[in-house]
Structure formats: C-alpha cells, structure tokens
Amino acid sequence: MNITVNPKGVTVNQFLMKTALPLGGYFIIEYLIRNYTASNIFLGLLNLPMMAVTAVLLFLSIRKLRDLLLDGQISGFVAWTFGVQLMFFAGLIEAAFIYLFNEFLVPTNLVTVHNQLVAQYESALTTIEGMASASNMAASMIPMVKEMIELLKDTPVATAIETAISMLSNDIFYGMLIMAFVAPIVRKKK
C-alpha cells in the first residue's frame, strides 16, 4: 500500500520503516534489561510495565500514521495490520541484535541465563523444603519442582539463532494481541 497524501511524499511503508527503528531500539533495551534482570525475580516484574510502554508506543505510532498520512481516518483492520507490521520490522531489528549479541559479543550469555534459571528453581526448592514440615501444600510441591529442575537441566541451551527467531515470533504475537486492543481506539480522530 503506497498511500501518499502528505507534502513530503512519504509512503506508509516508509513511515513504518522509520518508526520501526526507534521501536526496535526500545526492544533492544528491553531485551538487555530482561536479560540482566533474569537472576532477580523482583526485577523480572519490570516486564509488565515494559509491555505497557510497548502498547503506548504502538498507539502513538499508529495515531501519528493516521493523522499524517491517512487524513485522520483509519479502519480497525488497517490499524491492526500496520501495528503488526511495525512490530515485525522492530522485531527484525531486535532479532538481528540478539543474534549478534549472543553469537559474537557475549557467546556465554545463553548458558549463563540457563544456569541462573536452574539456580532459581533450586533456590525455590530449598525454600519449599524448609516450609514442607509446616505445610502439606509445600510438601506436595516438592516433586513437581524437582521434576522441573531435572527438565531444565536436560533441556539443551538455545542457540543464538533460535533465541532470535523466538523473540521475533514473540514480538509478532504480542503485536497481534496488543493491536487487538489498540486498533479500535485509534480508528478515527475525535
């Protein structure tokens, strides 16, 4: 779709590509924060606000697209489509970074994150075992947590390309979900 209605002659696709660059940069920062807070459960709670910021950025981007290039009107489906495209392009930028980061910059990163996850479950198991004498529920959780630890230990560490593709597919999926809520809101200028 090459709709050109602004004086500079910018097409919708050009707008989406230019908007995807800063969004991809935000995704890279989000990945680094998530990556380096993986060992702390409380810092892991940052994921929800970061996802909310993604929704706000998508809303602002699609609203700007609507106002600058589409005469202030956009259908819900077109808004949803552009939002998913924006998440795809931004996700491609993030995926390229994730691949380069995990393959060349910090090749031990994925192993470290995997080992931190195993250590978190082992720490949780120790805590649950300490509570087992006081609670039947805690005692019933011990076999499940032990099984999860064994599964994690047996699971091979993801490669850099697997991680990049996984994050790209996550970005597209989250884009679909977020835009299902954002598209009806951004449809027309009030």
Whereabouts are the PLM-identified features?
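Structural signal for membrane-spanning alpha-helices in multi-pass inner-membrane proteins
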Residues: E30, R34, L58-I62, E94, ...
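Alpha-helical transmembrane segments of multi-pass membrane proteins
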Residues: Q14, K18, P22, T81-I93, ...
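Alpha-helical transmembrane segments with an aromatic anchor "belt"
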Residues: L68-F88
